[in-house]
């Protein structure tokens, strides 16, 4: 009975989403405040109905209701209860329901926290978000219903959750990523509302920017957590592989970063209006593209869900409708919000525009490298591979001017400035950057690699100028805001991430060795000694754990416990890496296959500064969070009268 209730709640949600999509817009056209205000009620009802359906599915997993096909395919009585809850979004149908839940949650949040926003704007924004919800609810109900039954015959035991997903990181990674994806729908809705109304001013930017910041924070955390999970769970010691689905989350992050900065210019200087709208449309469009790549079956990835052609065609049609319709609307009405401001070449807004262009260019490089092999294969032209060298080379050389401008930008005033005002500071920063980028590799690794120097030069340039500018502000007694300190934290976070990338990419050491009890291998300054392998048993798996002692200069450093697990129901063998993490290095061991005569294949790594990559990502997210606390986002703006015909 419960699955039928869940299905009924989804049908109810579809009806409410349809009302939300139409009724408030009708109210805008008629100038009827009550009809416009109904959008908030519909948003609440939509969230409650979808949340109810989601809880029904969670309950089906907790009680092991294997009459539900989705539960039988992704759970097992031996699965710990917390993984049973996480299995709710562990495969295609449930993850789509999570998407719709979060979509309705964002819609409800806009309804709650929009009391200071003119009612006509709220009505348009919530209606557009309702339209997006309609598309995904139709997709779930007609192609991907998580409440489908296996009656009258159903298994007494489930197939189990994919062992790769039986990890704490994967409990939080998809919700965070989806919160970011879905969050950009708010910026998208504000952009479409601006095009419909024909106006975009600083107040619109002030409404949109906190929602964009929140989405960007969640997406940043999702990417950071996913990268860390890949590092410790997959057993290959990497943190980014330029996988198509990794790229699918990275592209909206790049455009979202550009959008945040563009909104700042629109808010401060009433510039970049059309550009800001285009970025908002592009960010959410790229989120839809990522959904298509994961669920269409056009690629093979550890992230991709198996899917049938009907699902792929539905998503493709929906994506074309949303993106195509948005771009057509932009082409037709974008001129109504075009800026009339001429910016000086040496001004903060011009430098921000240059970096916006570089971010979009980086996104296009990733988009080309991701889609070209897929398009080439679909056209019957054979298989081609675009791998890490292409992405690393193209991306690096786009980021060099980006880092240069990023360091200088906060030092330059809005409107017009003179370069000579900061000339001495730039000279000092240049000398400091040169010295640090040459000295640090030699101090930590006793050798200098050109690409490391380049990466450290970018990081030091950003960090030195950010710290120097903050010190100058403090010494002069200049008033600073949460937004300012958020910017400093985010820029320093990027510098920290670049340091981690520069060291880990160029100084990591990897060894694939055959080891048995008593064997030792030297890597960098460390000696790894293989002691033994013991049998272990978990709630739904059994395996072996290898004990590997590590010494440095003859003194004990740490002990690593690398596991090889066999999951009973799934019949899968998984590697659980052993990692000893530190501020400046990671020691990493992954147990491979058992060989003859008691020997094992073992993969050992020395990874310098790798944790700085994720620490920098967390600092960037913290910077975004600080910006959210800026008081100006809580100021009330007087409503503007809406023309009835401007829907």
Curated annotation (Swiss-Prot):
GO terms for cellular component: plasma membrane. It is found in: Cell inner membrane. The keyword Transcription regulation does not apply. The chain crosses the membrane at residues 9-29, 42-62, 94-114, 121-141, 176-196, 211-231, 236-256, 274-294, 312-332, 351-371, 390-410, 425-445, 448-468, 482-502, 609-629. Residues 30-41, 115-120, 197-210, 257-273, 333-350, 411-424, 469-481, 630-647 are cytoplasmic. Pfam families: CcmF_C, Cytochrom_C_asm. Required for the biogenesis of c-type cytochromes. Possible subunit of a heme lyase. This is Cytochrome c-type biogenesis protein CcmF. The gene is ccmF.
């Amino acid at each position: 009975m419960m699955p039928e209730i869940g299905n009924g709640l989804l049908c109810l949600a579809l009806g409410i989403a349809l009302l939300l999509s139409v009724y408030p817009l009708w109210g805008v056209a008629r100038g009827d405040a009550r009809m416009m205000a109904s959008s908030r009620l519909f948003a609440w009802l939509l969230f409650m109905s979808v949340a109810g359906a989601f809880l029904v599915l969670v309950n089906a997993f907790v009680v092991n209701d294997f009459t539900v096909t989705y539960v039988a395919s992704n759970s097992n009585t031996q699965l710990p209860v917390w993984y049973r809850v996480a299995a709710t979004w562990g495969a295609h149908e449930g993850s789509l329901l999570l998407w719709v839940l979060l979509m309705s949650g964002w819609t409800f949040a806009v309804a709650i926290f929009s009391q200071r926003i003119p009612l006509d704007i709220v009505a348009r924004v919530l209606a557009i978000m309702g339209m997006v919800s309609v598309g995904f609810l139709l997709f779930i109900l007609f192609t991907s219903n998580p409440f489908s039954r296996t009656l009258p015959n159903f298994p007494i035991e489930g197939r189990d959750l994919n062992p790769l997903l039986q990890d704490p990181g994967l409990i939080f990674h998809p919700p965070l990523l989806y919160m970011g994806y879905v969050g950009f729908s708010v910026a998208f809705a504000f952009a479409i509302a601006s095009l419909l109304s024909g106006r975009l001013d600083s107040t619109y930017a002030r409404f949109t920017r906190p929602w964009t910041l929140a989405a960007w924070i969640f997406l940043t955390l999702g990417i950071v957590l996913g990268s860390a999970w890949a590092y410790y769970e997959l057993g290959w010691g990497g943190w980014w592989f330029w996988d198509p689905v990794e790229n699918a989350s990275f592209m909206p992050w790049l455009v979202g970063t550009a959008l945040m900065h563009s909104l700042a210019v629109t808010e401060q200087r009433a510039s970049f209006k059309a550009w800001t709208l285009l970025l908002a449309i592009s960010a959410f469009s790229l989120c839809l593209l990522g959904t298509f790549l994961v669920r269409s079956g056009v690629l093979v990835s550890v992230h991709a869900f198996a899917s049938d052609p009907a699902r792929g065609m539905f998503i493709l049609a929906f994506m074309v409708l949303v993106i195509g319709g948005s771009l057509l609307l932009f082409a037709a009405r974008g001129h109504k919000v075009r800026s009339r401001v001429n910016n000086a070449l040496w001004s903060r807004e011009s430098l921000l525009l240059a970096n916006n262009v570089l971010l979009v260019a980086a996104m296009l490089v990733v988009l080309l490298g991701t889609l070209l092999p897929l398009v080439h294969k679909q056209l019957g032209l054979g298989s081609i591979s675009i791998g890490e060298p292409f992405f690393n080379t193209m991306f690096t050389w786009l980021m060099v001017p980006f880092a240069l401008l990023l360091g200088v930008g906060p030092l330059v005033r809005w409107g017009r400035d003179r370069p000579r005002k900061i000339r001495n500071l730039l000279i000092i920063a240049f000398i400091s950057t040169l010295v640090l980028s040459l000295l640090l590799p030699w101090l930590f690794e006793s050798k200098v690699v050109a690409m490391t120097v380049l990466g450290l030069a970018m990081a030091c340039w950003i960090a030195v100028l950010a710290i120097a500018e903050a010190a100058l502000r403090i010494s002069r007694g200049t008033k600073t805001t949460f937004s300012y300190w958020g910017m400093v934290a985010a820029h320093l976070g990027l510098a920290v991430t670049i340091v981690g990338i520069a060291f880990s990419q160029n100084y990591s050491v990897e060894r694939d060795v055959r080891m048995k009890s008593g064997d030792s291998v030297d890597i960098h300054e460390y000696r790894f000694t293989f002691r033994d392998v013991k049998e272990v048993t978990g709630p739904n798996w059994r395996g072996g754990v290898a004990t590997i002692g590590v010494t440095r200069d003859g003194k004990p450093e740490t002990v690593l416990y690398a596991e090889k697990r066999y999951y009973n129901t799934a019949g899968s063998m998984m590697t659980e890496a052993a990692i000893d993490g530190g501020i400046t290095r990671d020691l990493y061991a992954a147990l491979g296959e058992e060989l003859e005569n008691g020997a094992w294949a073992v993969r050992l790594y020395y990874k310098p500064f790798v944790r700085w990559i994720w620490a920098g990502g967390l600092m960037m997210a913290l910077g975004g969070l600080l910006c959210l606390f800026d008081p100006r986002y809580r100021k009330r703006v007087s409503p503007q009268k809406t023309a009835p015909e401007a829907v």
